[in-house]
């Protein structure tokens, strides 16, 4: 290893996804990079971990790339756990995840394996950045690569508060160039319940696919959802910490404990 900072690179689209190669390529001059990513796509697995079967770590050869790459037959959170405890020679200064094919903005972060990989690191005291790109069907990663080094370099040079990480989303670029980057707040949008009922052609039982309908809201003008629709890239500082609703606790503690005891 050199004297450069060490960055762990991961994702949820899988170790051979184009997005992670573009992420690696965009920041390879900033730090020593080690890639530990899922063997297969693990989209929408959130912060799940594998506990009912063994996990395997395998060295991966990226053609035409001098990269240190490993795959894990598990989830993004599994990858981070094994990277920190088995693969990496030392503690990384930063973890980056992505570039995800499709945005992870609003409340969709709770489903995202891309974001969950960073959350796993944050819970172990390591800051991180999740990167996602709105062009799902035909992502032109080269159009957003130039924005990534500045964001990563800022994170390397400016310590985040404990429990904090950055969630970065790039808008679709099919309608024009990105207008700029905004540090902003999380919106409300998420994938709504929209199950599609289907009939098996050879069997009599029905089955369902969860649809891709979005639950839309009137978004604040400083939210990531609103700004992405306007063509801006968004950076939201998210926080993992005490989830207790303290105002509810203070208001209801006496009444609740009197009622149930």
From Swiss-Prot:
Keywords: Cytoplasm, Hydrolase, Metal-binding, Nucleotide-binding. It is an enzyme of class 3 (hydrolase). Its main location: cytoplasm. It catalyses: a ribonucleoside 5'-phosphate + H2O = a ribonucleoside + phosphate. Its EC number is 3.1.3.5. It is found in: Cytoplasm. Its cofactor is a divalent metal cation. A divalent metal cation binds at residues 12-13, 43, 100. Nucleotidase that shows phosphatase activity on nucleoside 5'-monophosphates. Belongs to the SurE nucleotidase family. This is 5'-nucleotidase SurE.
């Amino acid at each position: 290893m050199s004297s450069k900072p060490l960055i762990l690179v991961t994702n949820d689209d899988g170790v051979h996804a184009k997005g992670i190669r573009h992420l690696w390529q965009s920041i390879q001059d900033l730090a020593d990079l080690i890639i530990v990513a899922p063997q297969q796509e693990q989209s929408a697995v959130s912060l799940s971990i594998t506990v009912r079967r063994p996990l395997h770590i395998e060295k991966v050869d990226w053609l035409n790339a001098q990269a240190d790459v490993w795959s894990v037959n598990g989830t993004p959170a599994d990858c981070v756990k094994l990277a920190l405890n088995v693969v990496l020679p030392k503690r990384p200064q930063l973890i980056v995840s992505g570039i995800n094919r499709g945005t992870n903005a609003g409340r969709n972060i709770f489903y995202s394996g891309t974001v969950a990989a960073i959350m796993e690191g944050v819970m172990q005291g390591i800051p991180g950045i999740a990167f996602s790109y709105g062009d799902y069907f035909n992502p032109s990663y080269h159009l957003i690569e130039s924005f990534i080094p500045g964001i990563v370099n800022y994170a390397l040079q400016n310590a985040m508060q404990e429990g904090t990480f950055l969630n970065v989303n790039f808008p679709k670029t099919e309608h024009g160039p990105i207008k700029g980057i905004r540090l902003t707040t999380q919106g409300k949008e998420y994938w709504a319940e929209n199950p599609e009922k289907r009939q098996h052609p050879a069997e009599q039982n029905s089955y369902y696919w969860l649809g891709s309908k979005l639950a839309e809201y009137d978004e604040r003008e400083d939210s990531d959802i609103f700004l992405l629709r306007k063509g801006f890239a968004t950076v939201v500082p998210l926080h993992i910490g005490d989830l207790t609703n303290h105002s509810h606790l203070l208001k209801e503690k006496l009444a609740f404990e009197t009622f149930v005891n």
